[in-house]
Every structure is written in structure tokens, then in C-alpha cells.
Curated annotation (Swiss-Prot):
Belongs to the UPF0391 family. This is UPF0391 membrane protein H16_A0156. NCBIfam families: PRK13682.1-1 (NF010226), PRK13682.1-4 (NF010229). It is a multi-pass membrane protein. GO terms for cellular component: plasma membrane. Keywords: Cell membrane, Membrane, Transmembrane, Transmembrane helix. The chain crosses the membrane at residues 5-25, 30-50. It comes from Cupriavidus necator (strain ATCC 17699 / DSM 428 / KCTC 22496 / NCIMB 10442 / H16 / Stanier 337). It is found in: Cell membrane.
Length: 55
């Protein structure tokens, strides 16, 4: 589960680079939304991984 958190985090970083860096000027809003969605999913996956590891 922690691997999913890392994958989602990397995808969120890539979306942020494209969205906030001006490379994809037409898709800035979409990149911002995807960044926060993937960030939340990554955090949830990280917490779930830590909870499952504790059992």
C-alpha cells in the first residue's frame, strides 16, 4: 500500500511541474485539481499502509 502512496506522490509532482511551471498553460486548472486529488490519495494510501503495517 505504501508503494501506491509513492506512485501517487510522483504523479502529483509531475502534474504540479506541468501545471505550475507554465509548460501546459491551457491545462493549469486541470493540473492543479489533479495535483490536489493525487496528493490526498497519496496521503490516504500512506496512512493505510502505516495502519496495516502496525497489525
Amino acid at each position: 500500500m505504501l508503494q501506491y502512496a509513492l506512485v501517487f506522490f510522483v504523479i502529483a509532482l509531475i502534474a504540479a511541474i506541468f501545471g505550475f511551471g507554465g509548460i501546459a498553460a491551457g491545462a493549469v486548472e486541470i493540473a492543479k485539481i489533479l495535483f490536489f486529488i493525487f496528493l490526498v490519495v497519496a496521503l490516504v494510501a500512506a496512512v493505510m499502509g502505516l495502519v496495516r503495517r502496525g497489525r
